[in-house]
């Protein structure tokens, strides 16, 4: 069994990007600039945005945190989005989800300039991804593809079962794994919470990518020998013996499944760290695209 180490791989990627930023600086170019829009003060969102800003600083990007009150109206937020779209100093930005209930998330995501949509959620980028054109790929699926590539996991002709159909992970993964190339060229089954007899699918899978958010539901008797398992699930489970009062669990019963797997991601330290690294990679791509356009 080989561990797909997202922590180490994400650090490698950050170092590669940092070296490229140094080259851009040395040539007198403009370094990438990423902004994060945070509405309200949701604890998890604050932590996540904070780690994105910190990562930007570590690799030499410019970064801006746009902090807005929970009470902001939809129209005011749309006006801010328009402002960011028109800001020539900015290469890409993300709007941290979830947004307050009185704001229509779809309307906000649609208002983002696709050329600055480094989260890859705009329908234009999603469509370009499906058509195998250059696009911003959502950071978590992008990170999974990068792990598979760097660890040389064979995907061509393999049966991949994706569990979960969200537009953030499941659906893009089903598209990416079936695209031409490596990783890719896989036969994909997309399953979800309404799928009957899920184990019948997982038992026949060469690769399982699970993003359901149900702690440790994937057991050893649901997988075959030699399977590759990518665990995207992150759930806080109460644990009085832990100083924090909780532990982070993935969708996979790691202890049991790892004994049968050829490759497996841990939780934490697997897919999670890759997400921020690939957001930075998308931002670097946005800078290059803008530089090419301005020549």
Swiss-Prot record:
Gene expressing this chain: folD
Complex formation: Homodimer.
GO aspect biological process, one term: methionine biosynthetic process
Protein name (database record): Bifunctional protein FolD
Domain of life per record: Bacteria
Functional note: Catalyzes the oxidation of 5,10-methylenetetrahydrofolate to 5,10-methenyltetrahydrofolate and then the hydrolysis of 5,10-methenyltetrahydrofolate to 10-formyltetrahydrofolate.
Keyword terms: Amino-acid biosynthesis, Histidine biosynthesis, Hydrolase, Methionine biosynthesis, Multifunctional enzyme, NADP, One-carbon metabolism, Oxidoreductase, Purine biosynthesis
Matching CDD domains: NAD_bind_m-THF_DH_Cyclohyd
EC number: 1.5.1.5, 3.5.4.9
Any one GO MF annotation of this record: methylenetetrahydrofolate dehydrogenase (NADP+) activity
PANTHER family tied to this protein: C-1-TETRAHYDROFOLATE SYNTHASE, CYTOPLASMIC, C-1-TETRAHYDROFOLATE SYNTHASE, CYTOPLASMIC-RELATED
A cellular component term, taken from the record's GO annotations: cytosol
Binding positions (NADP(+)): 164-166, 193, 234
Reaction(s) catalysed by this chain's protein: (6R)-5,10-methylene-5,6,7,8-tetrahydrofolate + NADP(+) = (6R)-5,10-methenyltetrahydrofolate + NADPH; (6R)-5,10-methenyltetrahydrofolate + H2O = (6R)-10-formyltetrahydrofolate + H(+)
InterPro entries documented for this protein: Aminoacid_DH-like_N_sf, NAD(P)-bd_dom_sf, THF_DH/CycHdrlase, THF_DH/CycHdrlase_cat_dom, THF_DH/CycHdrlase_CS, THF_DH/CycHdrlase_NAD-bd_dom
HAMAP family recorded: THF_DHG_CYH (MF_01576)
UniProt xrefs under Pfam families: THF_DHG_CYH, THF_DHG_CYH_C
Pathway named in the protein's UniProt entry: One-carbon metabolism; tetrahydrofolate interconversion
Family, as annotated: Belongs to the tetrahydrofolate dehydrogenase/cyclohydrolase family.
């Amino acid at each position: 069994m080989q561990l797909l180490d997202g922590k180490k791989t994400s650090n490698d990627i950050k170092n590669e990007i940092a070296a490229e930023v140094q080259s851009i600086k040395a040539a007198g170019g403009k370094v990438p600039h990423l902004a994060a829009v945070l509405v309200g003060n949701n604890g998890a969102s604050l932590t996540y945005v904070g780690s994105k800003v910190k990562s930007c600083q570590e690799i030499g990007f410019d970064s801006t945190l746009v902090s807005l009150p929970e009470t902001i109206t939809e129209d005011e937020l749309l006006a801010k989005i328009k402002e960011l779209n028109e800001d020539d100093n900015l290469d890409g930005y993300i709007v941290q989800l979830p947004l307050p209930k009185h704001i229509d998330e779809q309307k906000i995501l649609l208002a983002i300039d696709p050329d600055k949509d480094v989260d890859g959620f705009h329908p234009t980028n999603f469509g370009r991804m499906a058509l195998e054109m250059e696009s911003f790929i959502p950071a978590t699926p992008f990170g999974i593809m990068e792990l598979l590539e760097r660890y040389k996991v064979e995907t061509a002709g393999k049966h991949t079962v994706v569990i979960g159909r969200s537009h953030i992970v499941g659906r893009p993964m089903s598209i990416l794994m079936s695209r031409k190339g490596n990783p890719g060229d896989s036969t994909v089954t997309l399953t979800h919470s309404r799928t009957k007899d899920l184990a019948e699918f997982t038992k026949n899978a060469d690769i399982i990518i699970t993003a359901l958010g149900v702690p440790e539901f994937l057991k050893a008797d649901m997988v075959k020998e030699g399977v590759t398992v990518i665990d995207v699930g992150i759930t806080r489970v109460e644990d009085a013996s832990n100083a924090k009062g909780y532990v982070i669990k993935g969708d996979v019963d790691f202890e049991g499944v790892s004994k049968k797997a050829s490759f497996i991601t841990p939780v934490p330290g697997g897919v999670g760290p890759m997400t921020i690294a690939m957001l930075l990679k998308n931002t670097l791509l946005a800078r290059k695209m803008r530089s090419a356009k301005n020549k």
